[in-house]
């Protein structure tokens, strides 16, 4: 399963994990220490992606095609 993130900058990322799991990672980072990033895996490239939880505008389950 993948989840789409849209940041306040307009950047879009498709990351591994269902929406609830990705939401939990983002919330945990937001509640963590100052400037803690949410570490995710970009679905297409398998690269690590660090996201500032304060910059997430939209999180939604990606459609499977």
Segment roles from a protein language model:
Residues 1-65:
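Eukaryotic intrinsically disordered, low-complexity regulatory linkers and tails enriched in Ser/Thr/Pro
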């Amino acid at each position: 399963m993948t989840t789409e993130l849209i940041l306040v900058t307009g950047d879009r990322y498709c990351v591994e994990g269902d929406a609830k799991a990705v939401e939990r990672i983002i919330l945990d980072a937001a509640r963590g220490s100052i400037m803690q990033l949410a570490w995710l895996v970009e679905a297409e490239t398998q690269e690590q992606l660090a996201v500032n939880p304060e910059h997430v505008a939209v999180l939604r389950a990606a459609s499977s095609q």
